[in-house]
């Protein structure tokens, strides 16, 4: 945090991906408290959200909802892998989550429904309490990545996690003609 405060841009923000690491809400809470115990509040104020810290088998259970409800000053937590159908986001919100992540592989129309749900909840609360993040997952150019970015923009997702380049060696999956045309 010191390096970002000293050398980073003045308007930086960050997210943390829990990657379903926790099988128990108390485990995550203890980990969170240990992780953040010595961090300055000015740094923690830049956290946008924590993505899916709980394994999908327990993420949408009553016990997680109770734990989130009992946790004062919990970080904003969103679902990702648990967002399997159009009922997932409303259930997550009822349990105390603050939103979801959109990936085209989850369904473009489901993403539109989720965005409408989030916008409606924010209008009702009068704040920007609920949110949607974006990810490209494993999309690469020349077509899928562009389509994904258009959908993310249409949904109003300004910050999109870029993952596709981790799984593919550039455009090497395409024949030479496509690679040359892209360049």
Regions found by a protein language model. Give the residues of each.
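Catalytic core of soluble alpha/beta enzymes
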Residues: 1-143
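Flexible C-terminal active-site loop/helix
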Residues: 124-183
């Amino acid at each position: 945090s010191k390096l970002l405060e000293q050398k980073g841009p003045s308007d930086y923000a960050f997210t943390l991906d829990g990657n379903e690491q926790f099988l128990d809400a108390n485990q995550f809470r203890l980990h969170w408290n240990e992780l953040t115990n010595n961090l300055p509040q000015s740094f923690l104020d830049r956290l946008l959200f924590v993505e899916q810290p709980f394994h999908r088998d327990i993420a949408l259970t009553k016990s997680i909802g109770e734990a989130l409800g009992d946790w004062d000053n919990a970080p904003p937590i969103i679902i990702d892998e648990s967002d399997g159908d159009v009922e997932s986001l409303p259930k997550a919100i009822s349990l105390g989550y603050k939103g979801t992540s959109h990936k085209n592989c989850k369904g473009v129309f489901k993403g539109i429904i989720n965005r409408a749900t989030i916008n409606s909840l924010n209008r009702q609360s009068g704040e920007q309490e609920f949110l949607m993040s974006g990810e490209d997952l494993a999309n690469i150019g020349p077509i899928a990545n562009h389509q994904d970015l258009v959908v993310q923009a249409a949904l109003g997702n300004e910050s999109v996690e870029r993952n596709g380049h981790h799984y593919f060696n550039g455009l090497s999956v395409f024949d030479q003609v496509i690679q040359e045309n892209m360049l």
